[in-house]
From Swiss-Prot:
Record's GO cellular component terms: cytosolic small ribosomal subunit
One Pfam family of this chain: Ribosomal_S9
Alphabetic keyword roster: Ribonucleoprotein, Ribosomal protein
Annotated family: Belongs to the universal ribosomal protein uS9 family.
Name the UniProt record assigns to this protein: Small ribosomal subunit protein uS9
Alphabetized GO MF terms: RNA binding; structural constituent of ribosome
GO biological process, alphabetically ordered: translation
HAMAP family recorded: Ribosomal_uS9_B
Entry-linked InterPro entries: Ribosomal_Su5_D2-typ_SF, Ribosomal_uS9, Ribosomal_uS9_bac/plastid, Ribosomal_uS9_CS, Ribsml_uS5_D2-typ_fold_subgr
TM ranges: none
Superkingdom of origin organism: Bacteria
Length: 158
């Protein structure tokens, strides 16, 4: 590549053509739904988003029944509220693994990704809110010679 460029103008044109931003296009399946997977801790959620009345179903239950704590319900609705799309999409999710908090985070991550697949214009809003970033924090492993990951066994001088 270095041999083919003879002037600074040519270098500028080559740099412009290579630095084109990726274009995000709508990704839908045969039924007109957007599909995405979300992860958090040990939980994995599979999420489908389609236009509808705002009904959210998690593991064949209404999300208010599956996630009884209001904090978890709020976590689930954050990407929808941030993108001003409340009541416009029906969301179906199946989630497995982990506890309720991790599952709520996984469904939130999946909803965010599926919304961007359905409506690519929402990507900037959801990215700014931090909903598209996979939370990589997981439980630290237990080490041998220790009671837990970092806690030592009780020490007795005598």
């Amino acid at each position: 590549m270095a041999e083919s460029i003879n002037s600074l103008e040519e270098l500028g044109t080559v740099a412009k053509t290579e630095a084109a931003a990726p274009v995000h296009v709508q990704k839908l399946d045969a039924q007109g739904r957007a599909y995405a997977t979300g992860k958090r801790k040990d939980a994995v959620a599979r999420v489908w988003v389609k236009p509808g009345t705002g009904k959210i179903t998690v593991n064949d239950k209404e999300f208010e029944k599956y996630f009884a704590r209001p904090v978890l319900q709020m976590i689930l609705q954050q990407p929808i509220v941030a993108s001003n799309r409340a009541g416009q999409f029906d969301i179906v999710a199946t989630v497995a693994g982990g506890g309720l908090s991790g599952q709520a985070g996984a469904v939130r991550h999946g909803i965010s990704k599926a919304l961007t697949y359905y409506e690519p214009g929402l990507r900037t809003v959801l990215k700014k809110g931090g909903f598209l970033t996979r939370d990589s924090r997981v439980v630290e492993r237990k080490k041998y010679g220790k009671a837990k990951a970092r806690r030592s066994f009780q020490f007795s001088k005598r």
